[in-house]
Structures are given as structure tokens and as C-alpha cells.
Amino acid sequence: WRIGFCRTGAYAGRVCIPSFDEGGNLSYFIARTYKNDFPKYKNPPVDRNVVFNELYIDWQEPVILVEGVFDAIVAGNALPLLGSTLSERSQVFKRIIEECPTVYMALDADAAKKEMRIIKLLLQYDLKVYKVSTSGYDDVGSMTKGEFLKRKEGAALIDQTNYLYQCLSL
């Protein structure tokens, strides 16, 4: 992940995590405070429509969609959305549709409705979608890798048939 931190300058007091495109070029980075400063994140003033961590994604394996970079570190072959939404116009969405027929969703429990909207979108493209429970934790990043893997193994397959039931159970 090539994680670093800044002691001085515009990003002082922040952990910096770079993202590299498939050619190995720096495409973006996030800078998160490790103090109790506000704002929590201070990111570069460039377009963030990138596939974060693209260089290290194995597109031959299922990918895991998570909200943040620290979640992705725990999850493994994961794409951080840098939020809790996914647009059809985004590079992440386009790569998933082109390359990855199976997706695991693991957004924070407080984003359940947004997660179901993403699942609905992915199902419209005939992808196989599993929902990983994050209940009992703030997010994937607060789990151990072992706990996340256990939850991933027990993930619920969401299809057109049970999608509505899942929405009603929120």
C-alpha cells in the first residue's frame, strides 16, 4: 500500500495512502488525519474518478466494494469507493462491468440503503452480488482480517428474487 505520513506542509499530521493506475503511475491519494483534526480527510484538488488501488486488483478474482481505503486494506482484493455511492459513469463501475462478474459488497452498516442501491445497479448488469455483514463493527477497517474473511465466507447471495426482501428487512 506504500502508506506514508506528512510531518509538514499542506498535509501535515496526515497518513497518506497513494493509488496507482494499472501502469504503476500515481493516480490519486487520500490524506487522513491521525489526530482529531477537522476535516478528517484532505484530498488533492484533482478528479477522483479513478479506480483506487487499480495496480493491485486481481480482476480474475471477485472484488470487494468497501467505503474507504482502510477498509480495503483489511478486505484484500478490494476497491474503496471513497464514499458510499457508485455511479454508472465512474471508472470503478466501468471496470467492474467489463472485468468482474462477481462482487462482494461490504459497506458500513449505516450505509445499508445506499448499499442496496448499488446492489440493484449491479444486478441490472447480471453480476453475481454477495452482501457481507458489517453489523457490530463501525466498518470493515475495524475488523480483523480473520473476522472479515469469516463474514465474507458467510456472505448472502443477493439476486433479483431476494433483492426486494433484503430491502424490506432494512
Predicted regions span which residues?
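Acidic beta-strand-to-loop metal/phosphate-binding motif
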Residues: 65, 100-114, 132-133
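TOPRIM metal-binding catalytic domain and adjacent DNA-binding surface shared by DnaG-type primases
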Residues: 1-16, 20-23, 57-58, 97, ...
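Short, surface-exposed amphipathic charged segments that create phosphate/polyanion-binding patches used
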Residues: 15, 94-100, 139-154
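Short, acidic/turn-prone active-site loops that include or flank metal/cofactor-
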Residues: 82-90, 108-111, 134-136
